[in-house]
Amino acid sequence: MKPLETQNQPGRIGKALAMAVAVAALGWVAWTLWTGNRSWDASPETAEVPDAEPAVAGAIPPDFPRPGMPGYQQPPAGMATVGTPPGARPIPSPATPATARQLDAASLGAEIQRLREALLTAADGRGRQRLIQEFGELVATAIGQLGADAVAEELVRLLGAGFEDIDFRLPFQPGFDGRMETVPNWRSLLLDGLAATASPVAADFVRNHVLDQPRTTADWAMGLKVVWEASGQQRDDPYFSAKLAEMLRNPTWTQQPTGALLESFDFVVAQHNKDLVPDMVRFLEGETDSGTPFAASIVLQRMASADPSVAATVVRETTGVQLDAEVAKSRATIVAKLDPTSEAHLNVIRDYLADPGVSADEADYFLRVFPQVNVIITPNIASTQYPDTRETLARKQQAGLALFEAWAADPAFASQRSAIEESVARLTEVVEAARRAGIL
């Protein structure tokens, strides 16, 4: 899959949000399907993937850090690395797949060891991705046959056995099925298996041996995933909240963000953690090439569309501040996610437009994109996305049209007349199409 230009230049938020790969019937709502290749896949915790075209989602951008390039980091000392020895080929699966056999603790351990050996000698990135998927299927089968606690106990045994880690040279990439699409190393893969068990055994191990002290962002992210699943995805878990905040406020990690760190922003959405919204606002002003502003913008857009207080926090945290042009566009896009059918949302919009720190260019941009109904659908480490129905989207567009018609007659908006008239024309076309289709 060809990476989007903006995924390697995440500061160009406006362009990224405008790139829709599918447009719904009637041309009145754009849905952006974004299934991988995020800019933050190029993480110091990952390394080169030999394949130019991996077979599954999560392909590596062409400028992915390689030895000698900025951002490349050698695997930690003592970590085995996958390679392509002379004559290497993927190790075949046994004649009877584990998913088709009755497992016990011993055979589960043997199957996991087989996959470990296969991952060490797999000839290419495609092979490693297939083996990672096979591991997930094995864990799911074992949970069904042995029970979650028994599987967790076996994985904990393996994690505590003092094994040599394996650097897979793959990115930290969630999948759409709740499992990881790819992980950077063997330890992360075992932790993903623990997360699938949602077992108290898994959570206890992680609290004492993973989240007890900072090691790597991949370790911490997977530890959070284990605790999140074991708690039943409990939003108000104080331990989880504290550990998430600890990760997002670790200066060593935030100054050199990895894919695992940026994917962990999604926990803020999943938990609807409004205490961390100010942190997300600060991340908007990070180095654009790091992917941090783009990731933070997505988090804030998703939260603001459901809760106007999030957008209000964004406005409050940036009131009176002249922002960089790209950050200003990001702020405008977040506010544009607000619902014009809600008076509470409209109050936030009024405060935003009255802010002296909002430049004429930013206000013009906001007026041209509001109401923002584009949706970026992503594979996420924790949260689930529920896009609006056609009817809900049409009602938002209709309310937006009424608002723009009122603004067109308001002398206070005289300087933005061009943007307002453009939006009136845009929304009139959309609303008329929805009426013809019987949606309104």
Label the model's feature ranges.
Residues 33-285, 316, 379-440:
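Extended repeat-based scaffolds of very large eukaryotic assembly and lipid-transport proteins
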Residues 213, 251, 287-288, 303, ...:
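Short coil/turn helix-boundary motifs
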Residues 1-10:
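Juxtamembrane low-complexity tails/linkers enriched in Ser/Thr-Pro and polybasic
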Residues 301-381:
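Long alpha-helical repeat scaffolds
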Residues 221-225, 294-297, 329-331:
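Alpha-solenoid helical repeat scaffolds
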Residues 258-261, 291-296:
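Alpha-solenoid helical repeat architecture
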